[in-house]
Amino acid sequence: MAEFVRAQIFGTTFEITSRYSDLQPVGMGAFGLVCSARDQLTNQNVAVKKIMKPFSTPVLAKRTYRELKLLKHLKHENVISLSDIFISPLEDIYFVTELLGTDLHRLLTSRPLEKQFIQYFLYQIMRGLKYVHSAGVVHRDLKPSNILVNENCDLKICDFGLARIQDPQMTGYVSTRYYRAPEIMLTWQKYDVEVDIWSAGCIFAEMLEGKPLFPGKDHVNQFSIITELLGTPPDDVINTIASENTLRFVKSLPKRERQPLRNKFKNADDSAIDLLERMLVFDPKKRITATEALAHDYLSPYHDPTDEPVAEEKFDWSFNDADLPVDTWKIMMYSEILDYHNVEAGVTNMEEQFNGQ
């Protein structure tokens, strides 16, 4: 049985196994407090995220289960990976992942990025999205603070599938709105992986310009700012809006012409402008895909089709429509955690046997 140690962080009890030491607060992540720690087993620095009261409501339990399933399934160099998970005696859940020194939001607020860094960061974002989308997963809340970077400029996407985007009045970071695709904002009938391409386009523009591209004060203002640059959406796109109120609002807006992006991004090279124009398209079906973006001329310094893997299998979303009581989610979660540790133990045993021969 693991031995647990308690510490108070920002008035919150962190109850972690003795494997981890030197707890330091890093900040609030999605639905939990994040600390850095030293993993005594691997001698590496890690991030430990405490999920607050995961079994307090069915909604929270399901959200935690979804995050656990996604972290277990997604294995890619540009996606954050799970290195440990445990339930404390107080029944809080802790996810342990690799620790990267900073995130893109902090980098962008500290200094302008040089061209080669912008290219390399965008390449890694697209490489990660190609894999994630091939697994049938949509991030839904891509923004600079969800993109982690270390001192070697290695980039990893984190906080997957957590945003409750079905709720257009979603609370949380106000800046989340800046990166949100129009089909989510206008509550169109359905959305898919293309929403992440729009968000990545907004992030790309912010790296080029040094400030958010569409800093809307609210959803109406947000949409207005988008149309100032990209013009009024075409009629066939407007007619896909399911909500009558939203449709009436969009049709009442003055017609606007698309502005050349070159006028706004005067220092960007032509290939950067071309890629950005292909990402920021109103019609999701006409937006460039992650795979296509990787092959674009702008990313050619890093593009290697032999080293841009896809997922071996699709993520199983069958649980997502389930409306289950907390106790059932808890049993399912315990089962996933046991499975994770059995698989990890199996790998370790195999390695020990192999090395012992």
From Swiss-Prot:
Entry-annotated residues carrying Phosphotyrosine: 173
This chain belongs to the protein called Mitogen-activated protein kinase HOG1
- Listed binding positions for ATP are 26-34, 49
Q: What is the organism field in this record?
A: Gibberella zeae (strain ATCC MYA-4620 / CBS 123657 / FGSC 9075 / NRRL 31084 / PH-1)
* Cofactors named for this entry: Mg(2+)
State one Pfam family annotation. Answer: Pkinase
Give this protein's Gene Ontology molecular function annotations.
ATP binding; MAP kinase activity; protein serine kinase activity
* Entry comment, domain topic: The TXY motif contains the threonine and tyrosine residues whose phosphorylation activates the MAP kinases.
Please describe what this protein does: Proline-directed serine/threonine-protein kinase involved in a signal transduction pathway that is activated by changes in the osmolarity of the extracellular environment. Controls osmotic regulation of transcription of target genes.
> Which domain of life does this protein belong to?
Eukaryota
Q: Which GO terms describe its biological process?
A: stress-activated MAPK cascade
Cite the post-translational modification comment.
Dually phosphorylated on Thr-171 and Tyr-173, which activates the enzyme.
- What UniProt keywords are attached to this protein's entry? Activator, ATP-binding, Cytoplasm, Kinase, Nucleotide-binding, Nucleus, Phosphoprotein, Serine/threonine-protein kinase, Transcription, Transcription regulation, Transferase
Domain named Protein kinase is located at: 20-299
